[in-house]
Amino acid sequence: MGKPKGDAARSKARPSSSSLAASLLPSGSAAAVGFGGYVGSSRFQTSLSNEDSASFLDLDSEVAQHLQRLSRKDPTTKIKALASLSELVKQKQGKELLPIIPQWTFEYKKLILDYSRDVRRATHDVMTNVVTGAGRDIAPHLKSIMGPWWFSQFDLASEVSQAAKSSFQVGSSFGNSVFLVEAAFPAQEKRLHALNLCSAEIFAYLEENLKLTPQNLSDKSLASDELEEMYQQMISSSLVGLATLLDILLREPDNTGSANINSESKLASKARAVATSSAEKMFSSHKCFLNFLKSESPSIRSATYSLLSSFIKNVPEVFGEGDVRSLAPALLGVFRENNPTCHSSMWEAVLLFSKKFPQSWVYLNVHKSVLNHLWQFLRNGCYGSPQVSYPALILFLEVMPAQSVESDKFFVNFFKNLLAGRSMCESSSTDQLSLLRATTECFLWGLRNASRYCDVPNSIHDLQVDLIDKVLVKILWADFTELSKGSIPPNQRKSAENLGMGNSVSYLQELGRCILEILSGINLLEQNLLSFFCKAVQESFLNMLQQGDLEIVAGSMRKMIDFLLLLERYSVLEGESWPLHQFMGPLLSKAFPWIRSSELLDGVKLLSVSVSVFGPRKVVPVLIDDIETSTLLSVEKEKNMSPEKLIKVFQEIFIPWCMDGYDSSTAARQDLLFSLLDDECFTQQWSDVISYVFNQQHQGFNNLAAMKMLLEKARDEITKRSSGQELNQRIGSRPEHWHHTLIESTAISLVHSSSATTTSAVQFLCSVLGGSTQDSSISFVSRSSLVLIYRGILEKLLSFIKQSPLCSVNDTCSSLIVEAIAFDSSSSVDVIVVAKFAAEVIDGSFFSLKSLSQDATLLTTVLSSIFIIDLENRMTSLVDNTLSESKEKRKDRNFVCDYVHAVCSKMDNQFWKSINYDVRKSSASTLAQFLRSVVLLEDDLQPFELTLLCASRMTEVLEYLSLDQSDEENICGLLLLESDAWPIWVSPSSSASIDTHGMPVQLCELRKSKSQRYVSFIDSLIMKLGIHRFIVGHKDHGFASQAWLSVEILCTWEWPGGKVQTSFLPNLVSFCKDEPSSGGLLNSIFDILLNGALVHVKDEEEGLGNMWVDFNNNIVDVVEPFLRALVSFLHILFKEDLWGEEEAMAAFKMITDKLFIGEETSKNCLRIIPYIMSIIISPLRTKVKSGGSGKDTLLPLEVLLRNWLERSLSFPPLVLWQSGEDIQDWFQLVISCYPVSDKAEEAKELQRHLSTEERTLLLDLFRKQKQDPGASTVVTQLPAVQILLARLIMIAVSYCGNDFNEDDWDFVFSNLKRLIQSAVVVMEETSENVNDFISGVSSMEKEKENDTLEGLGHIVFISDPSINSAQNALSAFSLLNALVNHKSVEGEDNLKSLADETWDPVKDRILEGVLRLFFCTGLTEAIAASYSPEAASIVASFRVDHLQFWELVAHLVVDSSPRARDRAVRAVEFWGLSRGSISSLYAIMFSSNPIPSLQLAAYTVLSTEPISRLAIVADLNAPLNDESLNDQDSSNAGLPSEDKLLLRDEVSCMVEKLDHELLDTDLTAPERVQTFLAWSLLLSNVNSLPSLTQGRERLVQYIEKTANPLILDSLFQHIPLELYMGQSLKKKDGDIPSELSVVASAATRAIITGSSLSTVESLWPIETGKMASLAGAIYGLMLRVLPAYVREWFSEMRDRSASSLIEAFTRTWCSPSLIKNELSQIKKADFNDESFSVSISKAANEVVATYTKDETGMDLVIRLPVSYPLKPVDVNCAKSIGISEAKQRKWLMSMQMFVRHQNGALAEAIRIWKRNSDKEFEGVEDCPICYSVIHIGNHSLPRRACVTCKYKFHKACLDKWFYTSNKKLCPLCQSPC
């Protein structure tokens, strides 16, 4: 292995190949790598000799490890190894890489042919880093890697080839290929020199590759498909690489850079010689590459085409005659190639071969081998390569020898097949364009080159004519006109349209363009040829006219119109006369008489388009050429007609023909007329037309209708004429060019006439005025005439308004009449008819109103009239039209209003912006005054709807008008002007209260009604526009000027559709929070309200008996308007922190200053000060406490409070008070200064503000009330004393409770019990009275129902003051109870004087009374409901009247003890009314007029002990037994059948008798709420019963048998399953929508707790989301209590999408908790038997039950599915010992039956199965019907024995057998049973 021979002879002047290679490489690290490979045996050769190569052992260990991993078969391992190797190579430079290169080169050659493209790409990345790091040191290896390097550039995978090209890119263009080899050889000459240097090695490498086969490609065992793919990749890349290399090396040298030619010429010459010799060798050895042409691989065939093209271009000398003969069929007959990826290289090869070797055509049968395949190729749309193949067709015609085809047949077949391929291109407009472009080029080429195919001139002409006739006329033109050979019957034409793209508009346009270009080309070539096409088309057209088939004629004319439009579009007319003189002129000349006589619509359109295209003065001579008329002079052809002659022809022929008659063709004839208008003759022609129309008087001619259509056409003509380049310069481009005195005079006379109100008159006026749309502003009358027309229209509108039945509309009319309008209200014309006429005109010309902007008065009046009529139209829905006469009267009037409403709908922002600002402002002012009049005057309309309508209309108009802020404020100010009816509480000018004394009651009530209605209007405006528009509208006068409006609204209190607390006050608060300077406004409001209350409180002396107001609910109890407004206003100010301590102190000072007038007390102030003190006392005390130690801050409040306490102490005890004395006011004042709270923290905070002296005085005042017990009779006679006493007790307990002694507590309790007991007595008497009344009328006739309900109302209406007294007592007791509970929980030293042994019995006794109140109201409603639902509603409405009282009752009922409830129930049952305690609870819960707190209380009592056991099952049933099912074995006696069990009627109707109509109700409907509550109760009751007891099993069986599963469907109407679509299931709880999270949490909580009480507690007020939560909780309870029931429902679902969503919801949110609960219960279960054990696997959700008996045993595996319990539990036998297969199968089936049918815990099912197995071992025989000892449903034993065969059966099984078989025979022996 020595050195190579010849080294010694090498001269110094000749460098070695390695040194030359090194010179080509840049220094440093600018080298990169390409794509290489291996061929034949060379793949195993190293690139260096043994002497120069580095030892493998010298490699870095890590590099060596990765190189070794490259020989692995796994592509993933290779990719990871290459990635690691790439990083290692990056870290090395220069000489460090030399040891790596030999081994890497070896691996590189193997890797470039790897099957995985990722491996090949990663290989090039490593090679890039190797060459980059090695730099010039890679030179010795260059020749060995250049072949693979070059080969790698052409990998079929683009990402791999790009990775290779990124390092070796040749930046020169060779032929059509650009190859970039940049990084390794950045200089262009070095790149070329590198290829020259290594050319021999590259050719050798490629030659070796081409010799390989799939069998010898690899030494590894690979799959055949992988081998085939690798082979195709290698061959195609080698072929393309070879073609590219030949193009580069054998190209013509570039002489522009000849400076270095001498130095490089030898190397280049050598490379060219090597290339030529190698090419000859390979061409010969591979037999012209014919085998590759026949390959099944498209990539190999495409590469072969490219290679042959390169050979033809670069080494044509290699082609011998035999080679040409061999290749001719393969290349010229190549049109069988159907793979579009090959077509580009295919066409290049075919064209080059045919051009280079034209003699090749003689070696084959052209028709058979070429043309047949070419026709097929064209018919198939070039097999998907239209963009490539169609442009090549003309080149193919050029190179195809003429003598090889028959010209007369060739071209016809060529174009037929070419155009047949259009059906394959219909999806792409680009492909269609390519097809038609090729058609045009090839056709014109055929005409120009006809001489190539013919020697004789006549033959040339005949060929050209033949082409025009057979191709242009019969194919292209026929296709364009959708005709074939002259005509296609309609039935065949329809089928023809469905083929290809004949009916495609875009295709037809392009086809027409193609025909036009061909015709233009023919005209340039020889004009005489054009006549053959024109004559053929004309003859065909005229033949159709003669045949008379109008449908075919119309279609042909439409296509001719299309062709004319294309002529105009593509500007074919420029400089060419043939379109008219040769084509259209003769055709129109002969067709005009037929068109004129037939008046075919499309024929007239054809004339119009022809005139438009060519011009009237050119077309008219053609049309009249054959008409002999004495009045017409002859016209010389081909010359424009003179204006005079044109006018004469226009007058005598075209005007009469186009304007006579009015039919379907009139529009088309008028279009023709307009097209004939010549610019020079325009004025005369238009005047002639107008005169002719108005002068026609013959019968049947409608002048106005004809003019209307004519004017619309004129409007379009104006638009068309003004859109050109000469804008507004051309005659007829401006509206005034079309004005005519006859038009104006006719329009004016029509609008002022009372008889001309026809539809045609309306349409004529609308067409004259214009303005039908926003853009239609063209009018045909002058401005003065326009004003006269609209004055006439306005007069008609005002006459209509004047006769309005609404007084406000009628009243407003007078303000709209202006002097310029001659308005005669006494006219006898039909107002409805003329108003309808005017409305229709305005509707059709609305936007022409903008032209009246200069006449502001007229336009304002017109717009205002429209506003008023439109509002009347909107108000008609509020009129009571119960009388038929009223309906009839309004019917015609509404018809007019509807038109005006349509006008108003057009008034948008864009319209109003076009109107003069002064007009907009005046219109707004008129509208404001009109709306004000409507609200104040219309007493008979629905008030709320009326005010809402007026406010909405005002808001809409203000938004449209876009007025300035100041003008808008002025408009709002107009609405607040004072009138006779409004305001009624405060004067706007003086802000003083208005005195209404002495006003008649009826008038006063009327004024209040109007005022409430107007406040409703203002409030609606505030809601829509914002309160700032009215409160701070006039900033010049400040806030105070508008404070009166706030006071007026506050005093009004309620109005239609709103009230102060829910509407105005929230808006005011929000405004004041956002407006820092609103303090002055609030102070002004307070001042006005306080002064008004002081003045008016004396009027409400009797209404102030009870001042203890719930500020959130019952503030309406304050009757006096100013005081009520003042209290609510102060309450909201402090509640929302708008006022604080400072403002409270200022108010305190103001009110106390008014308390005394000199030495006398102001009685009015004394009456109202308690209300104010009750609100401001808390911030006052806070202010005093925070004021520090200064005495000045302590004196005012503390001194006054002490004085008031001392003043109250000076009075006798309340029990001695007599009516008429004024001590009540002082007591109320004192009590108001000591607020109480049932919240302990607030109570302690209040107590801390009290000084010792105050507490002492307060306690003394309380104890003073215990004096003189003999006055008890007075107490019962004065309810006010009871109220004050109850409140004083509350205060004393709250503030002085720790100082109470035993007597004090006795006094408190005795009074509370007495007051509450008095209400109990009243309620019990009411219940008894209702019971007696209903019992007495139950048999009465239905006619007396109204009397019965009236009598019932008298009974339940309780006016007894004991209810109010008891309400205060309940408040006191509730407060005391809260304080005691807080003491017991927190262990605080509060109320230490009250011992538990004292409190507990008193509490129970009082709560018993409260429960009796609760049951009484329920009993009363239940008894009334037994008569009718209306009766029950009357009872329920009484509770709403005493809402606060019953809410206190409900709160205390929930807090009552089980013992108190039990005693109350017993008392009710002992009472003996017609309804019991449970019925009363259901009556409250399902009340028709429910109170949420009472409903919750009823549910709580029904769902908890001791009532829950009585709540579900009907009274006639035996109580549900708690006896264990284990005790049933001994005897069956005493076990009642489940068939006897009945649910209570209240529950049964919602469980068993559920109606499908429930699914159609609203999601918050009362029916749904009641149903869900009933089911929640039922499920909670079942869950509370002990497991495996008779009672629970009977109830469960009854539910499963009778309950309607519709409940589950209704539940999932609430649960938002749609939120589970998509990816929702994969999200965590925090990511899912909140609506779904709440429902899921409710379901999970119900499963865990076994109760839905927490969800029910938050149910009210009823909302959709809360109902969804309850639905989720009920579903969770069902899954826990009735799993088998739910599973049966789920299994019967047919909606797959819904079932999958339900399963997903259950699996995610319910199943985990259920499975955890089941496994936990099984784990805790005590089976009490050594023979039975259970083991649990929580991870696998499995339970293994092991049963052993007498050396036999069996393991049963119970597996819970992830969507348990919707999917059944799976049971398998894991192991069995000593048990027969039959018994094993039997036990397995029995376990499956028990666990799958168990409605309860699985632990219960396992326990029952264990008992079943025990019984079998004890010898108990199983039931022959169900094959089980224990029945799976009722768990009974077989006890019914057949008297004949003695077998025993379960009773349930035997009953079912009898039922299904319809005979009572033993199932076994068939003997009678």
Curated annotation (Swiss-Prot):
It is an enzyme of class 2 (transferase). Residues 1-10 have a biased composition (Basic and acidic residues). Keywords: Cytoplasm, Metal-binding, Repeat, Transferase, Ubl conjugation pathway, Zinc, Zinc-finger. One of its GO terms (biological process) is protein ubiquitination. It catalyses: S-ubiquitinyl-[E2 ubiquitin-conjugating enzyme]-L-cysteine + [acceptor protein]-L-lysine = [E2 ubiquitin-conjugating enzyme]-L-cysteine + N(6)-ubiquitinyl-[acceptor protein]-L-lysine. HEAT repeats lie at residues 57-94, 96-136, 240-280, 281-317, 322-359, 365-402, 532-569, 614-652, 788-826, 853-892, 1059-1099, 1120-1157, 1163-1203, 1310-1347, 1370-1408, 1440-1477, 1507-1544, 1612-1649, 1676-1714. InterPro entries: ARM-like, ARM-type_fold, LTN1/Rkr1, LTN1_E3_ligase_6th, Ltn1_N, LTN1_UBC, RING-CH-C4HC3_LTN1, Znf_RING. One of its GO terms (molecular function) is zinc ion binding. Pathway: Protein modification; protein ubiquitination. One of its GO terms (cellular component) is cytosol. Its EC number is 2.3.2.27. Signal peptide: none annotated. Its main location: cytoplasm. Component of the ribosome quality control complex (RQC), composed of at least the E3 ubiquitin ligase LTN1 and NEMF. The complex probably also contains TCF25 as well as CDC48 and its ubiquitin-binding cofactors. RQC forms a stable complex with 60S ribosomal subunits. This is E3 ubiquitin-protein ligase listerin. It comes from Arabidopsis thaliana (Mouse-ear cress).
